[in-house]
Amino acid sequence: SVPGDPIDILWQQLAILKQLIAHSAGRLRLCLSAADIERCREDKVLAMVAHIEGAGGFDGEGRDLQAFYAAGVRSIGPFWNIANRFGSGVNGSFPGSPDTGPGLTAAGIDLIKQVNALKMQIDVSHMNEKAFWDTAHHATSPLVATHSNAHALCPQPRNLTDQQLRAIRDSGGVVGVNFGNAFLRADGRRDSDTPLTTIVRHIDYLINIMGEDHVALGSDFDGITLPDELGDVAGLPRLINTLRASGYDQLVLDKLLWRNWLRVLKNVWQQ
């Protein structure tokens, strides 16, 4: 956690993001629509969607949510791992169940309804199981887990059960695979000797449960330990080559790399 008022910190981070865009000489764009993303693809520049993980500092009336939406935020995860006024995040140690506490509060249900009204993406990645099912009940758009893996392969509380995976599939949503060692490995360790085939194993499993239209890359390049073979975002071509060597053709690779995300964002944003 970062000391200070969480709303002030969010505004500072958003200001930094906009400074990066201003200094990018047009190579980075903040996207507010699926059409914006498609233009970035055509122009061969980086497309960015502003996302907030953890709404703990938000007021319960929707003013903060409205303000960040007006500033360009189009995706939100109500929780990190800890509880806030909206409900409980997922916590607990490995191995463990995602059923770690109560679900959404009344304010949390209101938040989901406010997000629905704004047609923002809702991220379930850091929700415990009860909050997940509460969100599934109240959400009006496809469910999205931006950076989560299969609990059956790595029983971290943060990973998703088969039942949750099916619910995301049935909503028309997507799961973005997390590259963090601790969320990939069957032993739950953070060791970076994790082979890229472990990521492929999770993708295989998710596709078997959900189908190839509901799985994507999620990454989580943010303070986690990663496989040495991957390193950082520059290592993605090595992962793509590993997927090709594992039998994935270009049609499915395109879905994993961008098509599934774009389809879901179009549906969420209703464009």
Curated annotation (Swiss-Prot):
Pfam families according to UniProt: Peptidase_M19
Protein name: Uncharacterized protein in pqqA 5'region
Disulfide-bond pairs as recorded: none
Similarity comment text for this entry: Belongs to the metallo-dependent hydrolases superfamily. Peptidase M19 family.
One Gene Ontology term of the molecular function aspect: metallodipeptidase activity
Gene3D superfamilies: Metal-dependent hydrolases
InterPro entries on file: Metal_Hydrolase, Pept_M19
BP terms from Gene Ontology: proteolysis
